[in-house]
Amino acid sequence: MKNKPLFIAIMAVVLASSVYAQAPTIELVHVQGGEFLMGCTEKHSDCSVNEAPAHPVKLNGYYIAKYEVTQELWMFVMGGKNPSKIIGDSLPVTRVSWYDVTTFVSKLNQLTGKKYRLPTEAEWEYAARGGNHSKNYKYSGSNDLEEVAWFRNNSDDEPHTVGTKKPNELGIYDMSGNVYEWCSDGFDFYEWNSSEPLENPTGYNLSETKVYRGGCMTSYPDVCRVSARNQSIPNAQFNYVGFRLAMDENPE
């Protein structure tokens, strides 16, 4: 067969398209680029040291997932393997390390031909605040945590189906509570003291720890604030940490 390599290549594309057609839906929300004050301001009494100083940040536009990555999507991409302790297709996947997530994203991109990634910490916070539609809530979407989050007061210490609480100003769910979410950044303390905005920051790449954000089902309210920060070594797996996807506005 003279055109056997071409035939194989075409079949590979067809099969990949077929597999992608069966994949669980990934809904993305467009976040318009803009400038915001990142970190905890003096008007809040429950700031942690690692949230200060508040500093101006300017971001390009991007996309971020409406929901946390579910166990259904994880198993589809990873061949049926589910690391989560509490099982349910529509529950957020947990017990995934930062390294596990990078493997998942690579496989997902191979399956779909797209360029998904983790959000940066700045992108995560800007989206959690509601982007350029922000109403400056303490939590993502409300000053009343019960409205928008599963946390220690209402969760029975278990993760819940994604998207069952009220969304924030951009229509994004669960950015406060349910499960923490890995970001792409290495952790570092804020040291930006200029009045000029820091543009598209990506964190400290040489850091031994990675950032995760948002609070979880066992968290106290202060940890679910949009400015609250956490960190861990990238090979750590927790029952309360998952992630959500992001994508450049114009992926090349």
Please give the residue ranges for each predicted region:
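Short aromatic-cysteine micro-motif
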Residues: 23-24, 48-132, 153-173
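Surface-exposed recognition segments
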Residues: 44-57, 132-133, 155-158, 175-252
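Bacterial N-terminal signal peptides
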Residues: 8-16
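Bulky hydrophobic/aromatic "packing anchor" residues in well-ordered structure
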Residues: 31, 36-38, 64, 93, ...
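Bacterial N-terminal signal peptides that target proteins for export
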Residues: 1-8
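GGW-centered surface loops in extracellular recognition modules
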Residues: 22-32
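Short, solvent-exposed loop/turn elements at domain surfaces
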Residues: 36-47, 71-73, 84-85, 219-226
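Chymotrypsin/trypsin-fold serine protease catalytic domain
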Residues: 136-160
